[in-house]
């Protein structure tokens, strides 16, 4: 395995680091700062990026090739390798600002809406609810059957993150054959309803998507099982890469604070308990980095990588959660203030541990593979 970065990959990594530092971290503080000293009674409002700021950031990201990373250049994307995408998502993971390159699967190039999604005029969400639990396709509950000029879809309810999106990519199984299909659904499609929207612990929402004889044209069937597996693996690698960014930011900030903070006449960094925490975290971060880069390298080499991506996601997301916890402990009371990023990282990392395969399910699947190989 040769993980030496190409010249293009180094340039993209540096461009992403500069973009995050100049455009995102510089405004992170104002985003985190509450407008009022005390929140009003009831649920606290969700923090959202100003639409004008978001539009400006999208234009700047597109100019430097940091947008729609997976789509080909012909479709308006960057057409980057898995390694390059991993390096870029790692840099964007260093900030809690809700801005990163969108997940637009390559198969979306076949849709007439691809260009407007890339431009940010339309939004896309992955309605992969059941797959979040195990990362496997055998949990799909939505069903479809052929009907005149297309397909009819039914589902009792699917949890969808970011339910305000214009389109949803939804996997479903054919009622008789059991063959899986991946469909592009318009939120205004007949028979599709979205209700019971609730806030997550992160600055996002989830709602229930129900399909009742939802009729769509045949051109909305974009793929089958192979395409679904590639999307799952791509999301697992994205989560793993973002987790590396979280871990790196938390470790760097924790080291800086421990060196500068003096208690009882001594810097925190001189205390053995602090030294153990940062030592363990640095080892965990390095382990997660190698697992993630190995999975991305396998994908670029055309080698089997689905299990490697799942393992990298599981290890890296847990590392990010632990990194946020360490940063909170070392920063003390500052660590849980909303004007610092660590409590947001903590909540985000906990959610990422649940997405596209929970840890127990991944452990079981990987364990079975190892036992069979032995």
Which residue ranges define each predicted feature?
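Amphipathic, small/basic residue-rich leader segments at the start of a protein or domain
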Residues: 1-101, 370-374
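Glycine-rich phosphate/cofactor-binding loops in nucleotide/flavin-utilizing enzymes
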Residues: 2-5, 87-88, 106, 331-374
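Glycine-rich beta->alpha junctions and the first turn(s) of the following alpha-helix
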Residues: 2-14, 192-286, 352, 374
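C-terminal helix-coil-helix/basic helical segment that borders enzyme active sites and/or dimer interfaces
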Residues: 28-45, 255, 259, 263-266, ...
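N-terminal glycine-rich flavin-associated loop
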Residues: 98-116, 134-137
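A short, Trp-centered hydrophobic/proline-enriched beta-strand micro-motif
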Residues: 120-131
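A short core secondary-structure module
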Residues: 150, 154-193
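Glycine-rich phosphate/pyrophosphate-binding beta-alpha loops
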Residues: 158-163, 239, 351-358
């Amino acid at each position: 395995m040769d993980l030496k970065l190409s010249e293009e990959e180094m340039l993209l990594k540096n461009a992403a680091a500069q973009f995050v530092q100049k455009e995102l971290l510089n405004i992170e503080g104002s985003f985190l700062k509450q407008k009022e000293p005390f929140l009003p009674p009831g649920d606290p409002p969700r923090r959202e990026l100003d639409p004008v700021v978001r539009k400006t950031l999208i234009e700047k990201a597109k100019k430097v090739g940091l947008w729609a990373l997976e789509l080909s250049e012909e479709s308006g994307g960057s057409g980057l390798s898995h390694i390059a995408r991993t390096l870029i998502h790692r840099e964007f993971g260093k900030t809690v600002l809700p801005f990163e390159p969108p997940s637009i699967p390559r198969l979306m190039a076949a849709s007439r809406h691809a260009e407007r999604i890339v431009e940010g005029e339309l939004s896309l969400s992955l309605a992969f609810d059941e797959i979040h639990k195990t990362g496997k396709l055998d949990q799909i509950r939505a069903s479809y059957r052929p009907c005149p000029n297309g397909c009819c879809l039914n589902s009792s309810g699917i949890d969808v993150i970011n339910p305000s999106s214009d389109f949803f990519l939804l996997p479903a199984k054919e009622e008789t054959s059991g063959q899986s299909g991946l469909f592009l659904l318009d939120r205004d499609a007949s028979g599709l309803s979205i209700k019971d929207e609730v806030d997550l612990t992160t600055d996002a929402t989830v709602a229930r998507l129900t399909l009742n004889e939802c009729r769509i044209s045949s051109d909305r069937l974009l793929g089958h099982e192979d395409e679904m597996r590639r999307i799952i693996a791509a999301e697992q690698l994205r989560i793993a890469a973002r987790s590396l960014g979280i871990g790196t930011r938390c470790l760097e900030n924790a080291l800086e604070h421990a060196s500068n903070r003096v208690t009882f006449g001594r810097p925190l960094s001189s205390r053995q308990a602090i030294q153990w925490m940062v030592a363990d975290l640095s080892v965990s971060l390095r382990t997660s980095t190698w697992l993630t880069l190995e999975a991305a390298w396998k994908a670029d080499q055309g080698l089997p990588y689905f299990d490697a991506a799942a393992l990298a996601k599981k290890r890296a997301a847990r590392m990010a959660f632990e990194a946020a916890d360490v940063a909170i402990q070392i920063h003390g009371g500052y660590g849980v203030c909303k004007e610092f990023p660590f409590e947001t990282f903590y909540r985000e990392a906990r959610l990422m541990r649940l997405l596209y395969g929970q840890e127990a399910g991944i452990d079981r699947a990987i364990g079975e593979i190892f036992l069979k190989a032995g």
